[in-house]
Amino acid sequence: MKLLNKIKNENAIEFQVLIEKSEWEKKHNEAFEKVAKKTASKLKIPGFRPGNVPVEEAKKHVNEIEVFETTTNDLVPQALTFLEQDESFTSDNSETVDTPSIDILDFKDGELTLKIAYDLYPVATIDSYNDLVLTPIVNEAFDHEVNAEIEHALSSKSQRRVKDENELIEKGDEVRFDFKGMIDNVPFQGGSAKDHLLTIGSNQFIPGFEDQMIGLKVGEQKNLEVKFPDDYHATDLAGRSAVFEVLIKEITSVKPQELNDEFAKSFNLPNVNTVQELKDYIHNQIVLAKQERNSERAWLEIAQQLLAKAKVTPIPQSLIDREVSTLKQQVISQLSQYKIDLKQYLEFSKKSESQFQEDLVKQAKETIALALLVDDIAENQKIVVSDDEVKERIAEMAKLYQGEEEAIIERLSQNPDAVKEFLLHKKVVNYLIDLNKNNQPKDTASTLSKQEDKPKVAKAKTSNTKKVASKK
C-alpha cells in the first residue's frame, strides 16, 4: 500500500491510499472463493439438489460485483491500519471525530485508490470573556424567607380533625364555606365565592367578618354585617356597610404545632437538634437554592454573549446530527412524562416538523459551540476536576435515592466522565460569574428587589452543556 496524497482544510482531513495490484489480486482471489461457496449454498441448477451444487460449478455463476465489493470491504481494515501507522497520520496532531468516511476514488489496472476522510473536531476561540454583562446576583437569605419556611413546616405538622355537625367554629379552625356579599341588597363584584377556605383568626377578611363566624356549625346560615375600612384598596367599597350571607360546609379543628426543639428534631436532618439549628439549616438551603437558580440564569446570559463573541470553525455534520438526535430524544422523553407525543406537541406549539428540525439544528450548533468554549476556558484558566470531586458528587447524588444508594453509585461510577463534565461546566460558570460580577447593567434596582422574592428551597437543576463527542 502507498499513501498518494494528503489534503487538509479547516474542517476535514483526507488521505488517498493506493492498494497495489498484488494486494488486490490476493484479496480478490480470496473473495472469489468466499462468494463462490456462498453462491453454491443457494444456487439452483437442474441435476443438483439445492445446496449441493459443487463449488467449481458455482464459480461459473458468481456475481463479479459482489466479488468486487467483498474484496474492497476486506481491504478497508488493512488500509485503515496502514494509514494510522503512517507518519503523515501520526505526526498530524489534528483531533478527529469518530470513524472516517471511505470512498472509492479509482480502480484501474488492478489497483484500487481509496479516499479516507476524517471530520476534524471543531475549534472555538474567544478573545475575551471578562467583559460580560450580568444581572446582579443576590444569594442572601432574608429573615422573612426563613420565617415563611418555618411557618409552612409548622402548618404541615399541625394536627387536623374534621369536626362533626354539632361542633361549633372556634378561633383557629379552618372553615370551608360559601358566601355572597351585598351592599344595599345588591351583590357586588368579587363579593361571592363557593367552598372558600378560611382560618378563623387569620384576619384575611375585613374586620368583624371572622369573629361573627365563631359559634356557627355545619349547615348553618348567617348574615354577617360588616363595614369596609375607609382605606380599603377598592375605593368603590371603602367605608361602605355590607351584608355577607354565609353557609358553613365543613369545619376542621387545627391544633398548631409548637415551635420547639422536638419539632426541629422531627425532620431527622443532619446536625439539627434545636430550633436555631433548624433555622440555620433552612437559611443555608435558601442560599443554596438561590445560588443554583442564579447560576442557571447567569449561564443563560453568559452563553448568549459567548456565542456572539466566539469564533467557531465549521462543525462537522456528523456532530450536528448526533446532537440533534440527542436533543430530540430529550424532548420526546420530557413530553412522555406529560403523556404527550411529538405530534401533539407540534400541533400545540403550531410548528411544522421542518421548523422543529430547524430549531433543533440551531440548538445543536449552539450546544456544541458552548461545550467547546467551556473546554477552552477551562484549559486556559487551568480549571480542573479531581477524581475526589467526582466521587464526592456521585455520593451526593446517591443520597437523593434512599435505599438505592449503592446501585446509583455503581451506575454513575461506570460513567465518571459525564459527572466530570457536569462539574467542570459548573466550575467554569462560577469562574465567569465571579470574573464579571461587577459588570452590571445600568438599571439594577428593580432587579435587586425582585431577587428578594421567596425561592423554592428544593434544589434547582443546574444547566449543563455536555460534551458532544469523544475525541480521538
From Swiss-Prot:
Protein name as it appears in the record: Trigger factor
EC identifiers of the protein: 5.2.1.8
Domain notes: Consists of 3 domains; the N-terminus binds the ribosome, the middle domain has PPIase activity, while the C-terminus has intrinsic chaperone activity on its own.
Species for this entry: Ureaplasma urealyticum serovar 10 (strain ATCC 33699 / Western)
InterPro entries listed in its UniProt record: PPIase_dom_sf, PPIase_FKBP_dom, Trig_fac, Trigger_fac_C, Trigger_fac_C_sf, Trigger_fac_ribosome-bd_bac, Trigger_fac_ribosome-bd_sf, Trigger_fact/SurA_dom_sf
Coiled-coil blocks: none
Primary role: Involved in protein export. Acts as a chaperone by maintaining the newly synthesized protein in an open conformation. Functions as a peptidyl-prolyl cis-trans isomerase.
GO CC term (a single one): cytoplasm
PROSITE patterns, sorted: FKBP_PPIASE
Catalyzed reactions per annotation: [protein]-peptidylproline (omega=180) = [protein]-peptidylproline (omega=0)
S-adenosyl-L-methionine is among the record's keywords: no
